[in-house]
Each structure stands twice: as structure tokens, then as C-alpha cells.
Amino acid sequence: MNTNLLDFDLDGLAAYCEQLGEKRFRATQLFRWIHQRGASDFDQMSDLAKSLREKLKACAHITALPVLTEHVSADGTVKWLFDVGGGDAVEAVFIPEDDRGTLCVSSQAGCAVGCRFCSTGHQGFSRNLSTGEILAQLWYAEHSLRKRLGTGGERVISNVVMMGMGEPLQNYTALVPALRAMLDDHGYGLSRRRVTVSTSGVVPMIDRLSQDCAVAMAVSLHAPNDELRDPLVPLNRKYPIHELLDACERYLEFAPRDFITFEYCMLDGVNDQPEHARQLIELVRARGDGRSWCKFNLIPFNPFPASGLLRSPAARVTEFASLLSNAGIVTTVRKTRGDDIDAACGQLAGDVKDRTRAAERMARQRTIVLKQVP
């Protein structure tokens, strides 16, 4: 069996090297070559013994995901569409800013949560990504951007957010080794504060992540009460808001930051009224023993045809943000980036899936016609 070495964190790679009869320090060397230097050719790895390089050539590989398309926005945002096979594709987005470079990474092909305002959720769920498929997005983005920008080997991506396609905590087994590789000083060397997992609220896995790999946490809240959140985020029927907020408080005991970020997609006439802001204020004040324990990130909705939803007017978003801020809650409004390259997460991948399904339908129709010919 030929093994993709992107599928391992350092401990996993060490175990693999031991199976080959090698010492652990060889895994550390190999890990650095892969993740810090972006090497995919074992012959490039000059400090590895030739005997090990020959072993690896026979049983392993370092393979990124095929890139279907790359779109570069006028504001510098880059979106890649990666082929994960079976007619599925996933997206990763690089967002450059003055003081950081953030990569938004996907964890699943499709998503089973089915949030009403999410383009990915409307596609349905295909499968979980492997650890290697998650890391391959970072590996490709980091090293292709280094070459393009001519950084001389300096790191381009300073922050990773698991906010692409899929619910990360429903792919827990693959997620945690990927996070560990991002944090490892022999890998990407990112701090726990600079890696964020965004979840729609898988309560048991929030608790588990706090013990296994506590990074920064963002929660897709989007509503101040269960009645409103149930149809927007169907997972809320299983883990209602009070259970979710309890889990957030428990997570803070282990988190690298002293706050949870609540993401709140602003939907015209749905969840953007002053009464909704006041309900959020009540939720926040009921917890935290008077201390500041969360912040809100208000997100302008990226419309797509199947949603039946509209973006809240800018003036209403400003008013909503002011109500929260005046109550002492740190509140930001996310800048829209990459509007000219299909900004809504999942739209490009959805186009691929739609074309694949159309081709399959045409193939079935041709088969039926051929069978009917006497």
C-alpha cells in the first residue's frame, strides 16, 4: 500500500518510520521537509539517508490535491478549488491583510448540517476529508504562495480557520491530527491562538476538543433563541442554545483565548432586528459572572439562488453592531472579500457537483435509449 505522508501528524509519521525500521528523529527530519520546505520529491531531502529515501520511494508519496481552478480577486483574495475525486471538490481561500495572512480550510466534501443560509449545506453531504486532504490545502497554499510572492522561504499563512466546507467536529478523527500538524514547531508552527475551529454546535465534540487539542473556537450562532435557530441551523434541535453555551463555557477553561467568537450571519428580516440584538445581550449577560467572555462577528450574507434569503442592509448591520457594542460586547463586522470570485463558500464546488450529476444523468439516459433500440 502506497501511503500519502500528508496523512500524518508528527507522532503518526514517527510510528510509520518505526515500521520501516527507522529512528524517530528521521520522522522529524521528514516532517520538516514536507511541511516547512514543501518538498514532495524524496530525492530533495538531502539529510535523509539514501537507504531511507529508497524505502520511501517504494511505499510512500507526498501528493497534494489536484487544483481544478484558481481565482484571484482584485483585493488579493485567492480561492482554490481542489478535486477530491468522485465528482466532489472542496474550496480553500487565502485572505491577505496588512498584519496577517489567513487561510480558510474545508473539512468535508459537502455538509450534513444543512444550514439554510449556507451554499455548501444545500449540496448535501458526500464524505469526510482525510487528514491528508485537510493538510493538503494548507500545504499547497503555503508553498505556492511563497513561490509566487518570492518570500525567500518566509511563512505566508499566519492564521488558519476551519471555516470552509463542512462541519469540522463531525470529522473529528481526521481533524485533530491535521490541527496538531499545523501547531507543531516542526510543521507550520502556528500558535493555538492562530488556529480556529468553527462549529455549528456539536456539543460532545466541543468538550472532547478541549481535552485533545484546544485551539481558538468560533461558534456559528446566527440566532438568539431556539425557535429562530432551529430552522436556520437544524443541529440546534439536537443541541439547543443553552447546551451549546454551557459547552462554550467549559471550553474556555482550556482555550488559548479568553473568549469564544460567535458568528452571526445577518439575514434581512430574519435575525437582524433590534429585538434580536437585545435577546443576544441577555444571553451573554446571563453567563460569564460579569466578565467579558465572548465576542460577535457579524457576517454579511452572501446570497445564492437556492437560499431564498437576502443580505441585511448595511445600515441595519451597523445599528445591530452598535446595540451589542453599547452593551459592552466586543463586536466586529466582517469585511466582504473576494466578491468578484464567487464569495459564497461552496458555490464553486457546487458547480462541479452539479456538472457531475448532469453528466451522470446524461449517461443514464443514453444507456436507456441504447437499451430501447431494437
UniProtKB/Swiss-Prot annotation:
Cofactor note: Binds 1 [4Fe-4S] cluster. The cluster is coordinated with 3 cysteines and an exchangeable S-adenosyl-L-methionine.
Residues binding [4Fe-4S] cluster: C111, C115, C118
Top-rank EC class of the record's enzyme: transferase
SUPFAM superfamilies in the record: Radical SAM enzymes
Compartments, as annotated in UniProt: Cytoplasm
Domain Radical SAM core: 97-340
GO molecular function: 4 iron, 4 sulfur cluster binding; metal ion binding; rRNA (adenine(2503)-C2-)-methyltransferase activity; rRNA binding; tRNA (adenine(37)-C2)-methyltransferase activity; tRNA binding
GO cellular component, one term: cytoplasm
InterPro entries attached to this UniProt entry: Aldolase_TIM, Methyltransferase_A, RlmN_N, RNA_MTrfase_RlmN, rRNA_lsu_MTrfase_RlmN/Cfr, rSAM
Cofactor: [4Fe-4S] cluster
Entry-linked PROSITE patterns: RADICAL_SAM (PS51918)
Keyword check for GTP-binding: no
Protein name: Dual-specificity RNA methyltransferase RlmN
Organism: Delftia acidovorans (strain DSM 14801 / SPH-1)
